[in-house]
């Protein structure tokens, strides 16, 4: 309108449980009516291309309410939990050896029920993480993506076979970062790591444009939103 962009969003292809869908990225606009119209347009466009669902990460309560009016519902909750990190010189792991393709494979292995970007788009996510100072720690039994702030490791994703395997990753990261004593971990609410610990928080939303399916155990994270 008047050569001004009133609303913008990008529809990015994703998969979940073998189904094709899309992720609405960067949804912003001037006024709720314009934004609602854009959501309608994009969802219809993606449905015509065969997308059975649309996922997104709302920027705040106001946008979440607008999306709910458009048929979206909360999904993919997270758990945030603090952990003390023990000193253990025997805990070994590799650092920053994970490629975008490998990260997609690791997610498929540790949590197949995950909203997946393709490796090309995951490379963009990985590049943004590294640019922001992230480190990836990995072993045969798991991997974690973390940022260090002062004496704390902030894990934005952590997947492992067992609680102990996850602790080994954190202990190896502590040895690398030297001054670290604790970690704050964000995992999927239904993830089996440190089950029963942490505070639940909402994260993503989904709208079904095809046959609805069960996403109560599904996971979504690191979706280009920075």
Region annotations inferred by a language model:
Residues 1-40, 131-165:
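Conserved donor-binding loop and adjoining core beta-sheet/short helix segment
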Residues 28, 39-43, 64, 68:
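Short, well-ordered alpha-helical packing segments
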Residues 37-53, 168-181:
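Conserved acyl-CoA
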Residues 47, 70-154:
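Amide-forming acyltransferase catalytic core, primarily the GNAT-like/NAT-type
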Residues 54-57, 116, 138, 145, ...:
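A structural signal for short, well-ordered beta-strand segments and their strand-loop junctions
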Residues 57-60, 64-92, 159-163, 171-226:
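Active-site/acyl-donor-binding loops of N-acyltransferases
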Residues 103, 165-169:
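Hydrophobic side chains in well-ordered alpha-helices
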